[in-house]
Amino acid sequence: CDRRFSRSDELTRHIRIHTGQKPFQCRICMRNFSRSDHLTTHIRTHTGEKPFACDICGRKFARSDERKRHTKIHLRQKDKKVEKAAPASTASPIPAYSSSVTTSYPSSITTTYPSPVRTAYSSPAPSSYPSPVHTTFPSPSIATTYPSGTATFQTQVATSFSSPGVANNFSSQVTSALSDINSAFSPRTIEIC
């Protein structure tokens, strides 16, 4: 590749790139490395050794470049503190967007909003229907008979549901005579109900 080196060990290390030679082997996992310092760093993953400590917070690292990258975090934090502490030298008509002051306004007002979901349906018959906020809808058993011109509408409703705003457990049997609403509905409408 026509590269030149002043030291023979640098040339030897470089030639390994071209030949793919990896003479340094980890005795724990048998992984091979072209450089001895890479093997030394790798062995730290097995031993858990972390010889490079941060001078500011004391956190330890296995590699010096990891410590160097970590130290930059502290420098950025320090720069931010200096920016926040330094007063503005020129007055600007536009306020700064970043501020070290946090303002909160406590309120004793509790705001509630009506639910957009209706909890009951109006019914032409004096009976009760399940709420639309049910998580399950049981199938009602409906039996309609017409002995001598009178109608009987029987429904068994056993519903249990939980909702953040509503907590009801109820079981009821609704039996109502439809003879009082026969004038309002045709026999076909009563069959559908």
From Swiss-Prot:
One of its GO terms (biological process) is response to auditory stimulus. Residues 85-109 have a biased composition (Low complexity). Keywords: Activator, Biological rhythms, Cytoplasm, DNA-binding, Metal-binding, Nucleus, Repeat, Transcription, Transcription regulation, Zinc, Zinc-finger. It is found in: Nucleus; Cytoplasm. Residues 65-109 are annotated as: Disordered. Residues 69-79 have a biased composition (Basic residues). InterPro entries: EGR1_C (IPR021839), Znf_C2H2_sf (IPR036236), Znf_C2H2_type (IPR013087). Gene3D superfamilies: Classic Zinc Finger. Its main location: nucleus. GO terms for cellular component: cytoplasm; nucleoplasm; nucleus. The record marks R3, R7, R13, R31, R35, R59, R63, R69 as: Interaction with DNA. One of its GO terms (molecular function) is DNA-binding transcription factor activity. A zinc finger (C2H2-type) spans 1-18, 24-46, 52-74. Transcriptional regulator. Recognizes and binds to the DNA sequence 5'-GCG(T/G)GGGCG-3'(EGR-site) in the promoter region of target genes. Binds double-stranded target DNA, irrespective of the cytosine methylation status. Regulates the transcription of numerous target genes, and thereby plays an important role in regulating the response to growth factors, DNA damage, and ischemia. Plays a role in the regulation of cell survival, proliferation and cell death. Mediates responses to ischemia and hypoxia; regulates the expression of proteins that are involved in inflammatory processes. Belongs to the EGR C2H2-type zinc-finger protein family. Binds to DNA motifs with the sequence 5'-GCG(T/G)GGGCG-3' via its C2H2-type zinc fingers. The first, most N-terminal zinc finger binds to the 3'-GCG motif, the middle zinc finger interacts with the central TGG motif, and the C-terminal zinc finger binds to the 5'-GCG motif. Binds double-stranded target DNA, irrespective of the cytosine methylation status. Has reduced affinity for target DNA where the cytosines have been oxidized to 5-hydroxymethylcytosine. Does not bind target DNA where the cytosines have been oxidized to 5-formylcytosine or 5-carboxylcytosine. This is Early growth response protein 1. It comes from Taeniopygia guttata. The lineage of its organism: Eukaryota, Metazoa, Chordata, Craniata, Vertebrata.
